[in-house]
């Protein structure tokens, strides 16, 4: 149940999360001062996150050098804030120090960013981030006993190293989220190191916050992509839909005021300005709790808590009750004779208010669906307001809205039918084949990740009463992962079109896609059919990963094969592994059977 609530939170209210390591003073203390003290106290973590996210290839030793420089800068400024260098923005100082590290810009190929200034420099460092972390070595894993001993011997270095490894593998995750994960990691380490069954404890307790990290990572990347690719207006619309559903009694003027804080937060968070991101997050929470009477009846107890517990409390609070006087439909947008005049007076504000009114009346709809409805309404008014009798035209708006939702509902129902009819593994193979045919240019790691995410979305949502909103929200996040966040992300013309043309309708765009016609498969099998006895040593999970990779690489090699033929070859691969691992000489068996499977593939 907790996982389900977290899923709902990710979709509906992710920007309320606060770091569990934020200071513990009650809310009536000066928030700006508290937040600044937190930043000063945590300069080490903040520096590690920023550096490791900007320059993912940098070694831990290089990161430690920057931490030392930034700590000295902090101490100097705490002693005398009137010094000229202390008036600079923290992120500016950080980037200056990164650029000043001898030989580093040339070593990691970011010297071109150091030649830029201000916003252009920040943006350059942002675009230097790499979503594909295949370039990094595997995440180091320690034996539980060794992990506990390392923590006991040098807590600071142990935690710093953890923050470094997680940050460089999650370059687009907001700093407060990473700080939350780090705090939970330390709590888990303390608890599990006291247990007899340490390995089991670590495995059990790690799952929830790994899920938390993955879920928020997807949403944050999606939100930042919306901001950077489609502009502030789309991000504003997303936030209107989210807040109006969560807090249906909030007035439109109050919502507009809150949106100013929420939207400004994204500039720092999306650019990777760790300090501004933390400040922005704290400001949003303070705003909500200072106006709670006009925002929600569900958060009073939450706002009386200290900051570490406050964010979690609000996350898990229920959506506020719908106001008794809230009609089922807002007539002024459909039945009024002067809709066109109101729209023309201030189109942005008019459309924002429509989205607010529609969202607070429809808690059962997904965020993407609410954006689709808003787009349909906007296009309808564009058409109607040029007619002789506009009211007669837009009075049928609800029919258009219902048609739009019906189309989206059918897509979700079709996906949940796949979930009902196929087992978990077969469902994954279905999506691995489809995704690889659509975007064979993506790496094998990315495609296997996307396939697993699709399965998780359907497994999480398809048995719920709120199936539609849950599936539509989570699948939209998977498509956001596919589209990526960086400006230099180009996959193929058809996929790029869906990613870049219309944020609200990209789901239906992807539904209409077929296998990529521009893709040229490799001329050789590149070792795909070369198997060895090490397959017999693979544990179930590792063997499953190898099967997933085999299927994706098979589709890349033979994209023209139908799904049934691909499934048949995957079954043959499974049979070969089972047969040879039971043989007296597994290596000899693989040597004999591998060419047969390759020949069958060629003949298919």
Swiss-Prot record:
The keyword Glycoprotein applies. One of its GO terms (biological process) is vitamin transport. Disulfide bonds join 77-86, 99-114, 113-124, 148-193, 192-201, 224-270, 269-277, 289-303, 302-313, 340-385, 384-393, 416-462, 461-470, 483-499, 498-509, 536-581, 580-589. Residues 215-319 are annotated as: Binding pocket for hydrophobic ligands. GO terms for cellular component: cytoplasm; extracellular space. GO terms for molecular function: vitamin E binding. Residues 1-21 form the signal peptide. N-glycosylated; more than 90% of the glycans are sialylated. Gene3D superfamilies: 1.10.246.10. Transmembrane segments: none annotated. Residues 22-210, 211-403, 404-598 form the Albumin domain. Glycans are attached at residues 109, 434. It is found in: Secreted. Keywords: Disulfide bond, Glycoprotein, Protein transport, Repeat, Secreted, Signal, Transport. SMART domains: ALBUMIN (SM00103). The second albumin domain forms a deep binding pocket that contains palmitoleic acid (in vitro). Palmitoleic acid is most likely not the physiological ligand. Instead, this pocket may accomodate the covalently bound lipid moiety of Wnt family members. Functions as a carrier for hydrophobic molecules in body fluids. Essential for the solubility and activity of lipidated Wnt family members, including WNT1, WNT2B, WNT3, WNT3A, WNT5A, WNT7A, WNT7B, WNT8, WNT9A, WNT9B, WNT10A and WNT10B. Binds vitamin E. May transport vitamin E in body fluids under conditions where the lipoprotein system is not sufficient. May be involved in the transport of vitamin E across the blood-brain barrier. Forms a 1:1 complex with Wnt family members; interacts with WNT3A and WNT5A. Interacts with WNT1, WNT2B, WNT3, WNT7A, WNT7B, WNT8, WNT9A, WNT9B, WNT10A and WNT10B. Belongs to the ALB/AFP/VDB family. This is Afamin.
């Amino acid at each position: 149940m907790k996982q389900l609530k977290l899923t709902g939170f990710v979709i509906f209210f992710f920007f309320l999360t606060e770091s569990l390591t934020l200071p513990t003073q009650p809310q009536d203390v000066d928030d700006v001062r508290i937040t600044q003290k937190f930043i000063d106290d945590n300069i080490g973590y903040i520096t590690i996150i920023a550096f490791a996210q900007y320059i993912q290839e940098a070694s831990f030793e290089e990161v430690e050098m920057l931490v030392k420089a930034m700590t000295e800068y902090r101490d100097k400024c705490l002693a005398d804030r009137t010094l000229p260098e202390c008036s600079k923005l923290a992120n500016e100082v950080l980037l200056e120090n990164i650029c000043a590290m001898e030989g580093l810009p040339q070593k990691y190929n970011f010297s071109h960013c150091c030649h830029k200034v201000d916003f252009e420099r920040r943006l350059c460092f942002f675009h230097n981030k790499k979503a594909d972390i295949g370039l990094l070595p595997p995440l180091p894993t320690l034996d539980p006993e060794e992990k506990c001993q390392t923590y006991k011997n040098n807590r600071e270095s142990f935690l710093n190293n953890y923050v470094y490894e997680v940050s460089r593998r999650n370059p687009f995750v907001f700093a407060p989220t990473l700080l939350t994960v780090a705090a939970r990691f330390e709590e888990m380490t303390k608890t599990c190191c006291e247990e007899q069954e340490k390995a089991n404890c670590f495995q059990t307790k790690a799952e929830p916050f790994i899920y938390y990290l993955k879920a928020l990572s997807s949403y944050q990347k999606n939100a930042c992509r919306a901001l950077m690719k489609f502009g502030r207006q789309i991000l504003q619309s997303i936030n209107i839909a989210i807040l109006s559903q969560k807090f249906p009694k909030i007035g439109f003027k109050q919502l507009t005021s809150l949106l100013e804080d929420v939207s400004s937060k994204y500039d720092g968070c999306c650019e990777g300005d760790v300090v501004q991101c933390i400040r922005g997050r704290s400001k949003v929470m303070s705003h909500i709790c200072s106006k709670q009477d006009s925002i929600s009846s569900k958060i009073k107890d939450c706002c009386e808590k200290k900051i570490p517990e406050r964010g979690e409390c609000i996350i898990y609070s229920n959506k506020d009750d719908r106001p008794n006087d809230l009609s089922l439909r807002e007539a002024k947008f459909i039945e009024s004779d002067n809709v066109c005049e109101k729209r023309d007076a201030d189109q942005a504000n008019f459309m924002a208010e429509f989205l607010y009114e529609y969202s607070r009346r429809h808690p059962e709809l997904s965020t993407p669906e609410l954006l689709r409805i808003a787009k349909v309404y906007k296009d309808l008014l564009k058409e109607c307001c040029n007619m002789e009798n506009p009211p007669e035209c837009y009075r049928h708006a609800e029919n258009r809205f219902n048609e739009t939702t019906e189309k989206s509902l059918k897509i979700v129902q079709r996906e949940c039918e796949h979930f009902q009819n196929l087992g978990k593994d077969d469902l994954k193979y279905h999506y691995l084949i489809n995704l690889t045919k659509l975007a064979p240019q993506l790496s094998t790691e990315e495609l296997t990740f996307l396939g697993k995410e699709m399965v998780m979305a359907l497994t999480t949502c398809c048995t719920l009463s709120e199936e539609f909103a849950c599936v539509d929200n989570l699948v939209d996040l998977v498509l956001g992962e596919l589209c990526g966040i960086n400006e230099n992300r180009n996959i193929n013309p058809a996929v790029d079109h869906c990613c870049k043309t219309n944020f609200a309708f990209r789901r239906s765009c992807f539904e209409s896609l077929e296998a990529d016609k521009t893709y040229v498969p490799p001329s050789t099998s590149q070792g795909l059919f070369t198997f060895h006895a090490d397959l017999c040593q693979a544990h179930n999970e590792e063997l499953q990963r190898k099967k997933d990779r085999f299927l994706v690489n098979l589709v890349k090699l033979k994209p023209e094969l139908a799904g049934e033929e691909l499934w048949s070859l995957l079954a043959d691969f499974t049979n070969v592994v089972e047969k040879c691992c039971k043989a007296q000489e597994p290596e000899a068996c693989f040597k004999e059977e591998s060419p047969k499977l390759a020949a069958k593939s060629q003949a298919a």
